[in-house]
A protein has these predicted regions:
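Short, flexible coil/turn micro-motifs enriched in small/turn-prone residues
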Residues: 2, 133-134
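Extended ligand-binding regions for polar small-molecule ligands
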Residues: 13-88, 97, 113, 130, ...
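Functionally constrained cores in energy, signaling, and assembly domains
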Residues: 2-3, 23, 105
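C-terminal capping/gating helix-and-loop segments adjacent to ligand/active sites or protein-protein/ligand interfaces
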Residues: 93-123
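Single conserved hydrophobic/aromatic residue that forms the stacking wall/gate
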Residues: 1-12
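Low-complexity, intrinsically disordered Gly/Pro/Thr-rich segments
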Residues: 123-129
């Protein structure tokens, strides 16, 4: 079951079972669940669009899909405490898109955020060719339209 030893930590195979898992949040807090889900969707969408922590501020917002990603509240948050329209810009500036966050967690942190899973190096958990890759790369990671 163990794939490799990294320092004093054991890394198990990246696929122990095939089941759709998602971020877990407490019951009875649909507003928070929506925020967590859409942060994930936004990170995946940003990587699909090659929008990274380095280039989000100069992304072409004349493209409607890019503008929705970077400048739309999407009705998230609560009536008393809605998210700002630039919430996804805050996510990107903090952790980057999905590929950047994956690389910083499981690889050497040098991924450019848009060249695809195969460009990631020094990974303790490879993403290329696994369920963790984007759908466009044969993986399972996708996001609905940012609407």
């Amino acid at each position: 079951i163990y794939d490799r030893l990294v320092g004093s930590e054991m890394c198990i195979r990246d696929s122990l079972s095939k089941e759709p898992l998602a971020a877990a949040v407490r019951d009875n807090d649909d507003d928070w669940k929506d925020v967590v889900e859409w942060v994930w969707f936004g990170m995946v969408t940003a990587e699909e669009m090659s929008i990274t922590s380095d280039n989000y501020a100069t992304a072409d917002t004349s493209v409607p899909a890019v503008d929705r990603l970077l400048n739309s509240n999407l009705g998230l948050g609560t009536e008393a405490n809605p998210l700002p329209d630039t919430w996804m810009q805050s996510v990107l500036s903090s952790v980057g898109n999905y590929g950047e966050a994956y690389d910083n967690s499981f690889c050497d942190g040098t991924y450019d955020g848009h060249s695809g899973s195969a460009a990631m190096t020094g990974c303790v958990l490879d993403r290329a060719g696994t369920d963790n890759a984007l759908v466009s790369e044969g993986g399972l990671q996708f996001a609905p339209p940012m609407r």
